[in-house]
């Protein structure tokens, strides 16, 4: 086997494959290392992609030339728009995915890629020379060398599975794990955190009594994550809804001491926005029921994922409380739920490029950085892969701003604020969310994907044509006036000549009366109806960009900044922001601290105008 590559990617989950494909598209020779080739981009938790904010991230990945959206479209068995009745800033797609097909399609494309070498092995050591990445040593004893490395180990690093008092050294779904990488990272100077997440039981569909649950009825639609996919679902696979009840809660409360979480066995910090059923019963004691969704894991629907019932209870207690839930009285369990603890990096050790501050040419992406979710992981993998490729060419990294993308918000939060619990992207985290919509992801980011060579000239041209068409249509509508004798005027009792554009702003007007079957109706209506609000957010973003222009030198001595609060000094020394805008976003830094910092930089003339 060739032992010399341009890049090494450790881990072939959602982050790892994005990094590998991005590096390979830049014509680099990539070694992609994973424990088990049959588990590439497996979905150890929910069999879905997207959701609030997360669906927009997947759209952004696609606009940049990443793969998650494209393969999600090919493997989806259900797709819907969430928050459709709410404002456009919070709308997002969510799709149920055939998890086996998704993994298979990506594995096959990796195997076909001449720039990617798949290596089935563990990594036992990461080596650096004078704080610069050098090589990795495999479980086989072989040493692999490269100029750059992207670490994407997910929840596999020093991980253990917990059910009740049972603790098993294992990765997700009984996969291999390793403590060797954790040991190696500590020796290199990295600080590690201990995090926890969990997953519910899977059951056989044949054991469910569907007469006692609610069926989700969905219409066919033409939704897609990817501009490169034309797949349309002719038939949606249904999910089902049922509820826990007081008997369920009674069994859980009577056995709390047997839960790994509540017995004190789990030391890691769990996700705030994806609590276990034990947490929900304890924290929301006033509620006598909680939702449970039955989600098929594949197109054949043999196995059902019980969304809402993540647990670390022992197997016998799981069986007891599950049987109290309507529809599950005679259930057969394929796999019991569990909690998993794992090591993660301190994300404050990362740059915005996702290169680590500790070791040069060494990048990290995905759950190892303290995030949760396939979408957050894939986004980081793509950015790390892009920037590793740019590093190989001695070019500046791609750093997306908070006003550019949810991906920019995600990475900025990790790098500037850090996280003490598994980080999940929410629309509320984005201050410019009206700019970061589902419908304009391609408009916002395709220019970067094209410039980087990750999307083709034809794809980019099609996106440009789309928005040119929308602008031309708006211009046409502003100049075309409705005759008072027309059928539309009579229908809405319009007495004076009015431009079609102004008519579209009236709530009583049905847009189809004017736009007919115009292809980009949704995008056009959002643009004209929210023009004022969008303009204001752009102005806010522009003001913040001015602060981004004020650079903070690497060699700044914060002890010499007059009247800077002690807390501000401590945090600035640890986080080492590169601009005033980044310093402004650090928790505990006050406006007065920022003023003193700007005054100091102006006084000593060490900032870039």
From Swiss-Prot:
Quaternary structure (record): Homodimer. Heterotetramer of two MnmE and two MnmG subunits.
Would you identify the family this protein belongs to, as annotated? Belongs to the MnmG family.
Molecular function via GO: flavin adenine dinucleotide binding
Q: Name one GO cellular component term.
A: cytosol
Enumerate the transmembrane spans: none
The residues listed in the UniProt record as binding NAD(+), with positions renumbered to this chain, are: 270-284
Needed co-factor(s): FAD
* Main subcellular location of this protein, as a coarse class: cytoplasm
Tell me which residues bind FAD.
11-16, 123, 178, 367
Q: Does Flavoprotein appear among the keywords?
A: yes
This protein's species is Mycoplasmopsis synoviae (strain 53)
Biological process GO terms, please?
A: tRNA methylation; tRNA wobble uridine modification
Its function? Answer: NAD-binding protein involved in the addition of a carboxymethylaminomethyl (cmnm) group at the wobble position (U34) of certain tRNAs, forming tRNA-cmnm(5)s(2)U34.
- PROSITE patterns hit by this protein: GIDA_1, GIDA_2
Which SMART domains does the record match to this protein?
A: GIDA_assoc_3 (SM01228)
The protein's matches in HAMAP family, at most eight in alphabetical order, are given as: MnmG_GidA
Entry's localization field: Cytoplasm
**Which protein is depicted?**
tRNA uridine 5-carboxymethylaminomethyl modification enzyme MnmG
């Amino acid at each position: 086997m060739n032992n010399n590559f341009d890049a090494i990617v450790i881990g072939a989950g959602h982050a790892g494959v994005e990094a590998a494909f991005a590096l390979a598209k830049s014509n680099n020779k990539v070694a992609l290392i994973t424990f088990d080739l049959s588990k590439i981009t497996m979905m150890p938790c929910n069999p879905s992609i997207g959701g609030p904010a997360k669906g927009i991230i997947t759209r952004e990945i696609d606009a940049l030339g990443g793969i998650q959206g494209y393969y999600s479209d090919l493997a989806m068995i259900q797709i819907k728009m969430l928050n459709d009745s709410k404002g456009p800033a919070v709308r997002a797609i969510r799709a149920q995915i055939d998890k086996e097909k998704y993994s298979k399609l990506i594995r096959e494309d990796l195997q076909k890629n001449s720039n990617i070498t798949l290596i089935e092995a563990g990594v036992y050591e990461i080596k650096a020379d004078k704080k610069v990445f050098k090589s990795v040593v495999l479980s086989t004893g072989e040493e692999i060398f490269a100029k750059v490395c992207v670490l994407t180990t997910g929840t596999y690093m020093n991980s253990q599975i917990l059910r009740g008092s049972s603790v098993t050294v294992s990765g997700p779904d009984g996969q291999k794990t390793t403590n060797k990488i954790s040991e190696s990272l500590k020796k290199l100077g990295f600080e590690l955190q201990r995090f926890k997440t969990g997953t519910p039981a899977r059951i056989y569909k044949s054991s469910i009594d569907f007469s006692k649950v609610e069926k989700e009825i969905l219409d066919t639609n033409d939704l897609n994550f990817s501009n490169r996919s034309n797949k349309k679902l002719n038939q949606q696979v249904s999910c089902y809804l049922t509820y826990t009840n007081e008997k369920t809660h009674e069994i859980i409360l009577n056995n709390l001491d047997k839960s790994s979480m509540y017995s004190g066995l789990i030391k890691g910090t769990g996700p705030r926005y994806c609590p276990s059923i034990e947490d929900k019963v304890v924290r929301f004691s006033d509620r006598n029921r909680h939702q449970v969704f039955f989600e098929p894991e594949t197109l054949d629907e043999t196995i059902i994922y019980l969304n809402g019932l993540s647990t670390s209870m022992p197997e016998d207690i799981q069986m007891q409380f599950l049987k109290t839930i309507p529809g599950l009285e005679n259930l057969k369990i394929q796999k019991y739920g569990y909690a998993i603890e794992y090591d993660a990096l301190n994300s404050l050790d990362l740059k915005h490029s996702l290169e680590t501050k500790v070791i040069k040419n060494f990048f990290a992406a995905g759950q190892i950085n303290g995030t949760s979710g396939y979408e957050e992981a894939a986004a980081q993998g793509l950015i790390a892969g892009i920037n590793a490729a740019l590093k190989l060419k001695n070019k500046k990294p791609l750093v997306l701003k908070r006003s550019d993308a949810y991906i920019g918000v995600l990475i900025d939060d990790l790098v500037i604020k850090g996280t003490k619990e598994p980080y999940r992207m929410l629309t509320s985290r984005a201050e410019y969310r009206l700019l970061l919509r589902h419908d304009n992801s391609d408009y916002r980011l395709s220019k970067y994907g094209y410039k980087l060579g990750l999307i083709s000239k034809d794809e980019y041209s099609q996106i440009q044509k789309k928005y040119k068409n929308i602008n031309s249509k708006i211009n046409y509508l502003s100049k075309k006036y409705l005759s008072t004798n027309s059928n539309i005027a009579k229908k809405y009792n319009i007495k004076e000549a009015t431009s079609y554009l102004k008519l579209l702003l009236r709530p009583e007007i049905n847009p189809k009366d004017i736009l007919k079957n115009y292809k980009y109706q949704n995008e056009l209506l959002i643009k004209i109806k929210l023009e004022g609000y969008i303009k204001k957010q752009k102005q806010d973003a522009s003001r913040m960009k001015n602060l981004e222009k004020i650079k903070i030198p690497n060699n700044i001595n914060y002890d010499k900044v007059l009247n800077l609060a002690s807390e501000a000094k401590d945090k600035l020394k640890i986080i080492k922001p590169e601009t005033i805008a980044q310093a402004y976003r650090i928790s505990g830094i006050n406006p007065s601290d920022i003023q003193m910092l700007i005054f100091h930089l102006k006084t000593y003339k060490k900032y870039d105008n």
